Swiss-Prot record:
Localisation: Cytoplasm
This protein's GO CC annotations: cytoplasm
The family this protein is said to belong to: Belongs to the acetylglutamate kinase family. ArgB subfamily.
EC number(s) on file: 2.7.2.8
Source organism of this protein record: Rhodopirellula baltica (strain DSM 10527 / NCIMB 13988 / SH1)
Keyword ATP-binding: yes
Name of the protein: Acetylglutamate kinase
SUPFAM superfamilies linked: Carbamate kinase-like (SSF53633)
GO MF, one annotated term: ATP binding
Length: 287
């Protein structure tokens, strides 16, 4: 009986948050590393289905870095990176498109359908909602077919949300001539969140959030203002690999998104715990 009462208490706690976020858009960036963890992925997709069921409007944007690298290796193509961006020649682009649009995007959609949700894969093979152009590297390096998103077809995405369906979008864009480009998944998610006027953008990571001590998960900072985050970077508290994540969060806030979250996607039901509980499980960055 005590366990049943505890479950009821949890539902009551969630009720206030459900009312608050009902009808609001949350963009969820799903990274390549989590796509390899089948158990974690299953719980994350169940979380997304729950969010849609109780009236939120989740949108999933995904990459697939590890799977792409493995597929390129099988094809005899050596992966090359310049400042974190994958150099994408014509042969590499074929592999990227096959993995993102032909495999992962379809698989994620089918998994959500099997779990009882309604999802639609929006890729260049079906309906491409990300328009863009070739990314010009500021250092002058030619990254090949690497692009940046300049326009999002929000009408298509919102029409799905209004009919209780979840859009699942790979990090690929096309230009006005139909040329395909590989896009960084973080920046693709940011563009989608900005275009939709999302209330939240959630980066699913392999760390539990911003920590005062990078080696100690117990030092997680539950909430930060944009100003506090900039100060922690200046003070050296936020450093190394966490800096680009936090800078991406700050850029997203600057584009009008209300809140950005960094959470550990490997934690069971981390999405629900972050959004529907008072304390959350990651770091929330806000203006």
């Amino acid at each position: 009986m005590d366990q049943a009462i505890a479950k009821a208490d949890t539902l009551i706690e969630a009720m206030g948050w459900i009312r608050r976020f009902r009808g609001k858009t949350t963009v969820i960036k799903l990274g390549g590393s989590l796509l390899e963890d089948r158990e974690a992925l299953q719980h994350l997709l169940l979380d997304v289905i729950f969010m849609e069921t109780v009236g939120l409007r989740p949108v999933v944007v995904h990459g697939g870095g590890k799977a792409i690298t493995e597929a390129m290796a099988k094809a005899g193509i050596e992966a090359q990176f310049i400042r974190g961006r994958r150099v994408t020649d014509e042969k590499s682009l074929e592999v990227v498109e096959q993995v993102l649009a032909g495999e992962l995007n379809v698989e994620l959609t089918e998994m959500m359908e099997r779990f009882g949700g309604r999802a639609v894969n929006l890729s260049p093979r079906t309906t491409c909602v990300l328009k863009g152009k070739k990314l010009i590297d500021p250092e002058g390096d030619d990254l090949g077919f690497v692009g940046e998103v300049t326009e999002v077809d929000r009408d298509v995405i919102e029409s799905l949300a209004y009919t209780d369906q979840v859009a699942v979008i790979p990090s690929l864009c096309t230009d006005d001539k139909g040329q395909l480009y590989n896009v960084n998944a973080d920046t693709a998610a940011m563009a989608v969140a900005q275009s939709l006027g999302a209330d939240k953008l959630v980066f699913l990571s392999d760390v539990n959030g911003v920590r005062r001590d990078p080696e100690d998960p117990a030092t997680i900072i539950p909430a930060l203002s944009a100003e506090e985050a900039r100060q922690l970077i200046a003070d050296g508290v936020i450093k190394s690999g966490m800096i680009p994540k936090v800078e991406a969060c700050l850029e997203t806030l600057g584009r009008g998104v209300q809140k950005v979250h960094i959470i550990d996607g490997r934690l069971r039901h981390s999405l629900l715990l972050e959004i529907f509980t008072t304390d959350g499980v990651g770091t929330e960055i806000h203006q």
